[in-house]
Amino acid sequence: MERIKELRNLMSQSRTREILTKTTVDHMAIIKKYTSGRQEKNPSLRMKWMMAMKYPITADKRITEMIPERNEQGQTLWSKMSDAGSDRVMVSPLAVTWWNRNGPMTSTVHYPKIYKTYFEKVERLKHGTFGPVHFRNQVKIRRRVDINPGHADLSAKEAQDVIMEVVFPNEVGARILTSESQLTITKEKKEELQDCKISPLMVAYMLERELVRKTRFLPVAGGTSSVYIEVLHLTQGTCWEQMYTPGGEVRNDDVDQSLIIAARNIVRRAAVSADPLASLLEMCHSTQIGGTRMVDILRQNPTEEQAVDICKAAMGLRISSSFSFGGFTFKRTSGSSVKREEEVLTGNLQTLKIRVHEGYEEFTMVGKRATAILRKATRRLIQLIVSGRDEQSIAEAIIVAMVFSQEDCMIKAVRGDLNFVNRANQRLNPMHQLLRHFQKDAKVLFQNWGIEHIDNVMGMIGVLPDMTPSTEMSMRGLRVSKMGVDEYSRAERVVVSIDRFLRVRDQRGNVLLSPEEVSETQGTEKLTITYSSSMMWEINGPESVLVNTYQWIIRNWETVKIQWSQNPTMLYNKMEFEPFQSLVPKAIRGQYSGFVRTLFQQMRDVLGTFDTTQIIKLLPFAAAPPKQSRMQFSSLTVNVRGSGMRILVRGNSPVFNYNKTTKRLTILGKDAGTLTEDPDEGTSGVESAVLRGFLILGKEDRRYGPALSINELSNLAKGEKANVLIGQGDVVLVMKRKRDSSILTDSQTATKRIRMAIN
């Protein structure tokens, strides 16, 4: 109040008022500030001042022939004076209005195509809904976000080549369009832009917006997909937020979202297979997202998420050098440590072997709903400053930091045994054991941590063991802050290595990622994900496994048939039969397998007992490690639809139904495909027709190599002999005829000869 009185006093003296209002601004520093350099120091003032002049715009001289001197109201549109320092004329803002109303019209057909991203943005805003404005403290953290909705994911170089090819097709310069997306886009754009009158430079700018992902490091509280970022200025201020639902989705956001879901599913599935790394690669290479190969998306898409990064590491791509623990991304901002194995005792006297980080380090921790700054020494948390959306999120961050600190009081807070396992039923490593334990219940941990008196610091507050805020006391070293912690902006990518259990390490051997870090969150993908790999059959449940297994056998029947008779063990070990095993009751798997393998061996030994339908039906059961027993089965059980269902060894059942007349196979009422050869007529039709031009010499002769399928016969030279597998699973020796004249009689004699050769 005193100060205000003083000021009022001063202003009442006329001399003060005069000095403040009349003094000229001739101070050197001020003049320097506003006149040095080309950069405009006060653009808005400059603009207002310019527009207050009569002719603030300059235009090409030709404009005087295209625009009248005065408009309908008699106002002058351009000055006869030339612009100083150029041969342009001075023009009034009214001239622009005249031009917009009365100037020449041009074809507008190309505008929506060129300015596609703008037109789409208008549509999204038109159909978007803005909700109420809420006033509350905004915890914003800077994140790297995509600011450009509706783009393809080309690299800058790829996009440059496409733009040059589209806009300046005749310019010299090496342009190699290699990727599928480059070629598709180029073709599409060339067609769209025929006879386009818009300036090539503008077209190039707009194409760049459409082809390349542009990211900025912006303060965000809330949605980070590009359709939210484009309205960031409308949805969140320093102390307010406005609810908003976008009026449309864009493919780039959908790709990011679907990629994360596919990667999570694949990592989770690979982790439980016999060779996780090989399985992961096989699945990444055989999966498509929205019709694009997943490996192509991984190469181009900068999304950083644990599962996505594991897939990238497996493909030999560089990933971010930060590491993940408990769902938080840790980035070391200063300090260093060495690692040493140490044995520690839990509160339950269980011994744990942990890798202790010795040394002082500082980290930023960034999670989905909370962020923190952590300072720690060897097995000691010095300080943790957390901010988060709510109490729950803050607690999550605190637990992760306490476990990460490896403090003794945390390890002593363990009650009961630690025996958490991963999806493959392997014990988790000690750090994840501790994490899981306290994520389930952190009460003892918080109670045992210790409490301290705190100083009053602006924007900081203490937190008690029951997670209530306090200004006097806090758990030792812990503070809650109103301000968020920014994500690490330097997006440096490093070379990493990955072991067969999908643990990703940097070049110093620090573990950055492991399957334990992959989120269990399930979501529904926006784009169709097509997993061609048999390992992903089970993602849609047991029925899908059943249908897919039989479809696979039918599709590959030609090769399966040969392997069945020549090299059954190799066939039984095929990974396509792996998912099926989860449907067969564990206790009886071995017996079923032994029974089916014996049955198949009898079929191979006793000529003429080959039965296609039965082989297809029972084959998946033979894949389990067999147990020798004298047990016979008339039906085999599979667990689908929540209960055991029976597949009859001889004959049809609701699970496996083969229709002889239509040759269609239905599994649980679902169509599983058509068998191309008839299991019953075998010799009479197909073979006699196909064996025209071949002479049947007799029984199989091993000297002529493994049996060929009928399709492979066409490769034989005239006079060449080979073993061939015919419909009933029998193998006969044939020779390709030297003359074509006798082909007609072959089909009649073939049938007789086959019977003789067999019997």
UniProtKB/Swiss-Prot annotation:
Entry's Gene Ontology molecular function annotations: RNA binding; RNA-directed RNA polymerase activity
Sequence motif: Nuclear localization signal, positions: 736-739
Any Pfam family: Flu_PB2_6th
GO terms for biological process, alphabetical: 7-methylguanosine mRNA capping; cap snatching; DNA-templated transcription; symbiont-mediated suppression of host cytoplasmic pattern recognition receptor signaling pathway via inhibition of MAVS activity; symbiont-mediated suppression of host gene expression; symbiont-mediated suppression of host mRNA transcription via inhibition of RNA polymerase II activity; viral RNA genome replication
Site description Mammalian adaptation, residues in chain: 627
Entries under HAMAP family matching the protein: INV_PB2
Protein name per the record: Polymerase basic protein 2
Species of the source: Influenza A virus (strain A/Leningrad/134/47/1957 H2N2)
